Amino acid sequence: MLRSSVVRSRATLRPLLRRAYSSHKELKFGVEGRASLLKGVETLAEAVAATLGPKGRNVLIEQPFGPPKITKDGVTVAKSIVLKDKFENMGAKLLQEVASKTNEAAGDGTTSATVLGRAIFTESVKNVAAGCNPMDLRRGSQVAVEKVIEFLSANKKEITTSEEIAQVATISANGDSHVGKLLASAMEKVGKEGVITIREGRTLEDELEVTEGMRFDRGFISPYFITDPKSSKVEFEKPLLLLSEKKISSIQDILPALEISNQSRRPLLIIAEDVDGEALAACILNKLRGQVKVCAVKAPGFGDNRKNTIGDIAVLTGGTVFTEELDLKPEQCTIENLGSCDSITVTKEDTVILNGSGPKEAIQERIEQIKGSIDITTTNSYEKEKLQERLAKLSGGVAVIRVGGASEVEVGEKKDRYDDALNATRAAVEEGILPGGGTALVKASRVLDEVVVDNFDQKLGVDIIRKAITRPAKQIIENAGEEGSVIIGKLIDEYGDDFAKGYDASKSEYTDMLATGIIDPFKVVRSGLVDASGVASLLATTEVAIVDAPEPPAAAGAGGMPGGMPGMPGMM
């Protein structure tokens, strides 16, 4: 059944591919092309910018199934937008890429990055239309961005206390202090480097629990396995686990496990040295067709360390490792050979297994065995380090925050905010914090007076960045119903020397942003600025835009009788 599905899908794909490659193109040059791209950028940025700041608005998004989604998350709004005009849509897609890259690098700051991208591209297009050299504009922009990041790096503050962690999380969760406190509490329980996962709960209240689990540094083999496009994660409840020491290439090796997964209506996680060829194709096909929820992950480590780690996973989940030493092959798999757990989360970089179903006695015995090996190993520091890593993974806890709410829509919106807050908090712990609300970028605009460039066009590139980096703060203020230009002017002219002095849009007052807990992670600000300036200045250097031309309408009716006879289908 699975093999015939593969054959049918190839046959279905061929005409689609032929049509895609044979399509003729439509071109726009120079000013006309950039104007269309700019219109798409403006449309997307307008929708995303509405969500920025403590008084930002919600966005309602139609879903293919179920109720509409309510969100204030910039990257979710950006990804949902598809424009009818293909040239405009191309501009929107490039700005979506800014939001996605920032989300991937820092996990937050996507709305600010989108606002920055629009501001840089808009000003660049104006200057190019006035006759400036686009390459010199780009060079000037790059020099300015480097200077701004250097200034911010010199003025950032390291984060140390639980209160500061809660403040970062609160700001990222759109001012929800409950989210901030719960995340700070989770970090306190499992440590700053500990594993924290966000799940949808089944009660009205949010809950925090520390549970048994393991994380290892290997992510999904293919992005086609992703189940949650917003967070780019694979999330399975009550999955089965197929564990193999060797590479899996043949479809015969995974057919029994796929059949068991299909019959039991449970997702399947495959952990092996590698999964490729027919086996990987079959997994992806089954996932895309909705027949079996499946994900493949490479086993962590190398050599003996990989062998031991996959053995630890087997003990934790109650599964069997398929290995040549025991003459066990995956094609002989039965449900008794498969491990299981409460849930798994797989990202591009790592995998978290929660509450494995292995017997507690076996897990404890394995822990004692590793402890004994650590005591014996006195000379080889590398081996000892690997043993300690294995011990930490088997015996360490995982903090699980279960998000509650009165409806599916409410839970989904809150989960988005928890995800953003967790990412922002990790970024703050990693690289430090800055005054929030766009304040740090506003203050950084003053250092651009010192930038030395080669010519006038490059100076205009610096001016573009000087103007653009005040836009996020201005947008936050305008979303709160205030006059952005006046307040930004006062922050630069009167409070320019006070790095932490900013404007609290929620209370409509000037304040010390660090003291009041309005802060942004340095990593989020840095990633947003670099990604926005990179894509926007490249867009400005575009001279030709090419899209697939619309398909001509199919001819209807018989020859000589346009449209066919009334009430009768056209003859082919």
From Swiss-Prot:
Cellular compartments annotated: Mitochondrion matrix
Keyword line: ATP-binding, Chaperone, Mitochondrion, Nucleotide-binding, Phosphoprotein, Stress response, Transit peptide
Chain segment of the transit peptide: 1-25
Residues the record lists as Phosphoserine modifications: S485
One GO-annotated biological process of the protein: mitochondrial unfolded protein response
Signal peptide extent: none
Residues that bear Phosphothreonine: T102
Gene Ontology cellular component terms for the protein in this record: cytosol; mitochondrial inner membrane; mitochondrial intermembrane space; mitochondrial matrix; mitochondrial nucleoid; mitochondrion
Alphabetized GO MF terms: ATP binding; ATP hydrolysis activity; ATP-dependent protein folding chaperone; DNA replication origin binding; protein-folding chaperone binding; single-stranded DNA binding; unfolded protein binding
InterPro entries: Chaperonin_Cpn60_CS, Cpn60/GroEL, Cpn60/GroEL/TCP-1, GroEL-like_apical_dom_sf, GROEL-like_equatorial_sf, TCP-1-like_intermed_sf
Protein family according to the UniProt entry: Belongs to the chaperonin (HSP60) family.
Protein role: May participate in assembly and/or disassembly of proteins imported into the mitochondrion. HSP60 are ATPases and have affinity for unfolded proteins.
PANTHER family on file: 60 KDA HEAT SHOCK PROTEIN, MITOCHONDRIAL
Record's protein name: Heat shock protein 60, mitochondrial
Annotated source species: Saccharomyces cerevisiae (strain ATCC 204508 / S288c)
